[in-house]
């Protein structure tokens, strides 16, 4: 159950309270609690393991020797300079499928992978083409057209192609939402939907691929035994009724032998399978070209392919050569071989079949050609029962009373019952294979570009081929020939082969090798898919299949794949196996669409697909179409497949899938109450799911009204109604005395939140002092997994003129608290200049100054802001700083590549900072800062005098900066500092504070600035000048916020550094990461 711990002070502290709820306060004279030698938690940077970016356990004393970036030098051990990091960020390497996930292996050495090299055409388009075009096109498409007619066949193909196109659009969005490591479709589904759905759908996809192998092998054997070498059959039918059983037994024997041979080939030399892939693809392309060439030829020279009809019944052209009952030979009439098949003798008086006697024998052309007008006859469907005669529509026939169908007669009969939904199930496997390109994602040069382009082009190409073939088959081939599945009326030839030109053998041999190659590809891909699932460890009993040979080949997975494939071969019927794999592929495609729809509707910050032509409605339509096709194909198969997936899902959930992949289903947990809170309780969210859950620290005035209402406006623009927002504030006092004021303050805050249309929670704390109250909020706001990870506060504008000289300590300690809590910190400077929600920026830039890498928040925040209509038209520009030794040209290329992988559109500029000498102005500014600090520490002035001295030094500071920017050379450092107090007053102060020593104030006039402070001031001045030069007119500037000093003695100097760093800018957002990665290039 959710637990909260709050650190509270053990001893009473003499800390007072300032006027700001977000500022730390301390009474004058209170002892410094921090030992410089022993920094407390919150100093510097957090130390936490992955996914936190800081993993360095050894302090590096002199990491950075230069002067330009001295302001950030205490953080260099955890937040490296961008210039040193860009090359690693841009030039990523894909991880091979099955290795430990990149998000779980961030601290270990990456496995070296060969650089990808394939482009869109070779890597995606051709593999998809090869996998989509296959056995159904050559063996069943003509039969589907004959049974369903051109119109319904067109509808079947259009539905299936629409389903795959919608799925490809969803898959393209997922594939372009980050780097897709090798692992392809399984990786995309599992990382988008979580381990439960990922495991269930992954296994369904594996089973579909395995049964596809069985279907291809059965297709190979059917081509071999039916069209290449019928005499090779082992089992021979003694009667006509036994032919079907004999064929099935032959398929089982030859199929098992072919499977064993292919499994050995895959086990011994998978590289040869890959090398032969182009050969198999060439066979497919040549076969299709031969079909189109044959269609063109029929327009002017149709082939002479006679088909014999008895009445309106089609006759199988076997055991007779003349389509006639009698023929004239030597001026005499004799019976033909056809007569002897229907009669019990060759004489004219022999007893014959009644239908044979009553009806005439006619001969028609099987392929009359495009211009024959047969298209209209084939327009409508002709469904039939099993064992029905294949009859020609429109031909007269004399019915007979004998309805029995005696065996041995050479009729062409239907082998199975045909109807629309059954044909959908048989046809759908012919459009699968759209994920062949994504499965090769690890071998592509640019997967984000190649996968959408290649896959969609392949679907368009194959859809055109299928749809055109349906129309052309209906226009060229006689209906009875189309419905003749095995070409019995054509002397056992392949129907589509008889249409092809120049020879039927082009189709026969081409289809044989293409189906053989497709079977090898399935037996190659399925074991690797199972190996990836096993190595993920989400299904414990499958983990043994994650092991293999020394080179990583999945030996055990191949063995299981062969056994499952054998069950499909024992079914022995291609028409029975096709609906099974249709179920598994449809379920896989359905969840791809679901993944895209969920991610789009959740609008997680990591959902930034580079492919823009998607919409959740398209994904939902694709998901609905997949589900509908599952039940159209076979409702009982659909229920069985869903039952298998459901059992796997519950098993993974029961065993506890302790995998965190940053999936969309986890994001839904935040919208459910108790159950969801318990689910998101375990550990921090994955980098892909990270979004700013903001705690807004508000300041209240004496009337309990919000001082900076635009801070809430900015929060609503940043959040856009998504995620968690907690608005917090602190009242000083005891709850018994302040509960009325607390209620009034909470009502004021809620009304302001309502006015800003901001959805969130209000949490107000009454504490004895503001310092502890703010610390309580940072520690304990939220519940369980609904806790903030980011603190947003306004910059204390009046930190120099506050009533309490130590009011700035409240701010610095807040920075330390957020760092210790591993929370990000956003500080809005000049918050009253920020836009309200009603304002619109019609132009302008959001400038990001990326100095050090502290998790990537600087990249994520502008992206989130630009989702809001206030900032939508602003352009994003990213600046980074190059030192003398850096290659700025290469840095720019690397940064552009990194942003490309992040799917963020932004202009990139690398600014070179020359390491020049420290200017006199910087030296003077540092001296003034230290003099002010020493004065406030060593002299206990009255309130008015202290304000007067602080203001004087601030005015001289500002004036000297104005002179320095107006002239090329800054004025020299003054010899002394003018004071407004008298000598007598000074002596009285000294006698009153003898414990402070008499030498401290004398040293004030001869003070030399500390070299470390000079270098830090130099950094602040130089960066400020560079930022002003580039971004003075920007609508918003985002800057890395340097961490507070590890020694608390320099806190007041830290405030001065930040003031100088941001001087002259209108709207500034200082960003300090929480010590963990918040943005990733991965999907």
From Swiss-Prot:
Region described as Scissor helix: 664-680
Compositionally biased spans, kind Basic and acidic residues: 12-27
List of residues binding chloride 2: 135, 429
Main subcellular location: membrane
GO biological process, alphabetically ordered: cell volume homeostasis; cellular response to glucose stimulus; chemical synaptic transmission; chloride ion homeostasis; chloride transmembrane transport; potassium ion homeostasis; potassium ion import across plasma membrane; potassium ion transmembrane transport
The reaction(s) this protein catalyses: K(+)(in) + chloride(in) = K(+)(out) + chloride(out)
Subunit structure as annotated in this protein's UniProt entry: Homodimer; adopts a domain-swap conformation at the scissor helices connecting the transmembrane domain and C-terminal domain. Heterodimer with K-Cl cotransporter SLC12A5.
Name of the gene encoding the protein in the UniProt record: Slc12a7
Function (record text): Mediates electroneutral potassium-chloride cotransport when activated by cell swelling. May mediate K(+) uptake into Deiters' cells in the cochlea and contribute to K(+) recycling in the inner ear. Important for the survival of cochlear outer and inner hair cells and the maintenance of the organ of Corti. May be required for basolateral Cl(-) extrusion in the kidney and contribute to renal acidification.
Annotated binding of K(+), by residue: 131-132, 429, 432
Pfam families: AA_permease (PF00324), SLC12 (PF03522)
Keyword Transport: yes
Side of membrane Extracellular, spans: 143-149, 226-249, 301-419, 474-504
NCBIfam families: 2a30
Glycosylation sites: 312, 331, 360
Native organism: Rattus norvegicus
Activity regulation (UniProt): Activated by N-ethylmaleimide (NEM). Inhibited by furosemide, DIDS and bumetanide. The inhibition is much stronger in the presence of 50 mM K(+) in the uptake medium. Inhibited by DIOA. Inhibited by WNK3.
Protein name, as recorded: Solute carrier family 12 member 7
Record GO terms (molecular function): metal ion binding; potassium:chloride symporter activity; protein kinase binding
List of residues that carry Phosphothreonine: 973, 980
Modified residues (Phosphoserine): 30, 33, 50, 62
Transmembrane intervals: 120-142, 150-172, 197-225, 250-271, 272-300, 420-440, 451-473, 505-531, 555-573, 574-598, 613-635, 636-651
Tissue expression: Widely expressed with highest levels in kidney, liver and pancreas. Expressed in choroid plexus and suprachiasmatic nucleus.
Keyword annotations: Cell membrane, Chloride, Glycoprotein, Ion transport, Membrane, Metal-binding, Phosphoprotein, Potassium, Potassium transport, Symport, Transmembrane, Transmembrane helix, Transport
InterPro entries given in the database record: AA-permease/SLC12A_dom (IPR004841), KCL_cotranspt (IPR000076), SLC12_C (IPR018491), SLC12A_fam (IPR004842)
Residues reported to bind chloride 1: 433-434, 589
